[in-house]
Protein backbone atom coordinates (compact mmCIF):
# COMPACT_ATOMS: atom_id res chain seq x y z
CA UNK A 1 0.00 0.00 0.00
CA UNK A 2 1.24 3.47 -0.85
CA UNK A 3 2.25 5.54 2.20
CA UNK A 4 -0.03 8.40 1.18
CA UNK A 5 -3.01 6.00 0.96
CA UNK A 6 -2.18 4.44 4.30
CA UNK A 7 -1.87 7.86 5.91
CA UNK A 8 -5.28 8.88 4.53
CA UNK A 9 -6.87 5.69 5.85
CA UNK A 10 -5.45 6.26 9.34
CA UNK A 11 -6.70 9.85 9.21
CA UNK A 12 -10.24 8.63 8.39
CA UNK A 13 -10.01 5.99 11.13
CA UNK A 14 -9.06 8.64 13.66
CA UNK A 15 -11.83 10.96 12.42
CA UNK A 16 -14.64 8.55 13.34
CA UNK A 17 -13.79 9.19 17.01
CA UNK A 18 -14.30 12.94 16.65
CA UNK A 19 -17.43 14.22 18.45
CA UNK A 20 -18.57 16.12 15.33
CA UNK A 21 -18.12 13.17 12.93
CA UNK A 22 -21.87 12.40 12.66
CA UNK A 23 -22.72 16.04 11.98
CA UNK A 24 -19.89 16.41 9.45
CA UNK A 25 -20.73 13.19 7.57
CA UNK A 26 -24.41 14.09 7.50
CA UNK A 27 -23.62 17.53 6.09
CA UNK A 28 -21.28 16.07 3.45
CA UNK A 29 -23.79 13.46 2.30
CA UNK A 30 -26.79 15.81 2.27
CA UNK A 31 -24.86 18.56 0.46
CA UNK A 32 -24.05 16.24 -2.46
CA UNK A 33 -27.73 15.93 -3.37
CA UNK A 34 -27.11 12.27 -4.18
CA UNK A 35 -29.78 9.64 -3.65
CA UNK A 36 -27.34 6.77 -3.03
CA UNK A 37 -24.33 6.47 -0.73
CA UNK A 38 -21.91 3.58 -0.27
CA UNK A 39 -19.97 3.27 2.98
CA UNK A 40 -16.40 1.95 3.09
CA UNK A 41 -14.86 1.43 -0.30
CA UNK A 42 -11.92 0.37 1.89
CA UNK A 43 -12.05 -0.70 5.52
CA UNK A 44 -14.93 -1.86 7.67
CA UNK A 45 -17.01 -1.13 10.75
CA UNK A 46 -14.63 -0.67 13.67
CA UNK A 47 -16.88 -1.24 16.67
CA UNK A 48 -20.42 -0.79 17.97
CA UNK A 49 -19.93 2.97 18.45
CA UNK A 50 -18.91 3.31 14.80
CA UNK A 51 -21.95 1.30 13.67
CA UNK A 52 -24.25 3.44 15.84
CA UNK A 53 -22.78 6.60 14.31
CA UNK A 54 -23.38 5.28 10.79
CA UNK A 55 -26.97 4.46 11.73
CA UNK A 56 -27.38 8.02 13.04
CA UNK A 57 -25.95 9.53 9.83
CA UNK A 58 -28.46 7.47 7.84
CA UNK A 59 -31.31 8.70 10.06
CA UNK A 60 -30.17 12.29 9.49
CA UNK A 61 -30.07 11.81 5.71
CA UNK A 62 -33.50 10.23 5.12
CA UNK A 63 -33.60 11.09 1.41
CA UNK A 64 -30.45 9.05 0.76
CA UNK A 65 -30.27 5.26 0.43
CA UNK A 66 -27.22 3.92 2.29
CA UNK A 67 -25.34 0.72 1.40
CA UNK A 68 -23.13 -0.62 4.20
CA UNK A 69 -21.14 -3.73 3.24
CA UNK A 70 -19.32 -5.51 6.06
CA UNK A 71 -17.41 -8.66 6.93
CA UNK A 72 -17.92 -8.07 10.64
CA UNK A 73 -20.15 -11.01 11.67
CA UNK A 74 -20.90 -9.49 15.09
CA UNK A 75 -23.06 -6.85 13.36
CA UNK A 76 -25.74 -9.49 12.58
CA UNK A 77 -27.46 -8.88 15.89
CA UNK A 78 -27.87 -5.18 15.02
CA UNK A 79 -29.13 -5.53 11.45
CA UNK A 80 -32.79 -5.17 12.44
CA UNK A 81 -31.97 -1.87 14.17
CA UNK A 82 -30.70 -0.32 10.95
CA UNK A 83 -32.67 2.69 9.70
CA UNK A 84 -35.09 1.96 6.85
CA UNK A 85 -32.84 3.79 4.38
CA UNK A 86 -29.75 1.69 5.21
CA UNK A 87 -29.00 -1.76 3.79
CA UNK A 88 -26.46 -3.61 5.95
CA UNK A 89 -24.96 -6.37 3.79
CA UNK A 90 -22.76 -9.19 5.05
CA UNK A 91 -20.07 -9.83 2.45
CA UNK A 92 -19.09 -13.50 2.33
CA UNK A 93 -15.34 -13.70 2.96
CA UNK A 94 -14.49 -16.59 0.61
CA UNK A 95 -14.78 -16.89 -3.16
CA UNK A 96 -17.54 -19.33 -4.21
CA UNK A 97 -18.98 -19.36 -0.68
CA UNK A 98 -22.77 -19.60 -0.43
CA UNK A 99 -24.69 -16.80 1.26
CA UNK A 100 -24.83 -17.26 5.03
CA UNK A 101 -28.08 -17.74 6.86
CA UNK A 102 -29.03 -15.33 9.62
CA UNK A 103 -28.52 -12.26 7.48
CA UNK A 104 -31.20 -10.12 5.87
CA UNK A 105 -28.84 -9.18 3.03
CA UNK A 106 -25.63 -10.71 1.71
CA UNK A 107 -23.14 -10.44 -1.10
CA UNK A 108 -21.15 -13.27 -2.60
CA UNK A 109 -18.19 -13.49 -4.96
CA UNK A 110 -17.88 -16.34 -7.42
CA UNK A 111 -15.98 -17.55 -10.45
CA UNK A 112 -19.02 -18.60 -12.50
CA UNK A 113 -20.11 -15.70 -14.73
CA UNK A 114 -23.59 -17.27 -15.05
CA UNK A 115 -24.21 -16.83 -11.32
CA UNK A 116 -23.02 -13.21 -11.15
CA UNK A 117 -25.83 -10.67 -10.82
CA UNK A 118 -23.71 -7.51 -10.63
CA UNK A 119 -23.55 -5.90 -14.10
CA UNK A 120 -20.49 -3.71 -13.40
CA UNK A 121 -17.93 -5.89 -15.27
CA UNK A 122 -20.02 -5.45 -18.43
CA UNK A 123 -20.38 -1.69 -17.82
CA UNK A 124 -16.79 -0.53 -17.49
CA UNK A 125 -16.75 -1.57 -13.81
CA UNK A 126 -19.44 1.00 -12.97
CA UNK A 127 -22.85 0.64 -11.34
CA UNK A 128 -24.40 3.01 -13.89
CA UNK A 129 -28.18 2.66 -13.37
CA UNK A 130 -27.96 -0.54 -11.29
CA UNK A 131 -29.06 -0.07 -7.67
CA UNK A 132 -29.16 -3.72 -6.54
CA UNK A 133 -26.78 -3.07 -3.65
CA UNK A 134 -29.21 -0.52 -2.21
CA UNK A 135 -32.46 -2.33 -3.12
CA UNK A 136 -33.90 -4.18 -0.13
CA UNK A 137 -35.97 -6.42 -2.40
CA UNK A 138 -32.67 -8.02 -3.47
CA UNK A 139 -31.42 -10.34 -0.73
CA UNK A 140 -28.06 -11.28 -2.32
CA UNK A 141 -25.85 -9.56 -4.86
CA UNK A 142 -23.43 -11.94 -6.58
CA UNK A 143 -20.20 -10.43 -7.86
CA UNK A 144 -17.86 -12.02 -10.38
CA UNK A 145 -14.37 -12.60 -8.96
CA UNK A 146 -11.65 -10.54 -10.63
Enumerate the predicted regions with their spans.
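Class I S-adenosyl-L-methionine
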Residues: 1-146
Amino acid sequence: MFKVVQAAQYKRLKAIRHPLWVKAMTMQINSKKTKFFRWHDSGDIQDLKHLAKIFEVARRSPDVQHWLPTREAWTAKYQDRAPANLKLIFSMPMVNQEAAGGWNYTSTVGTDPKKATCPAPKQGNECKSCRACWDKKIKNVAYLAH
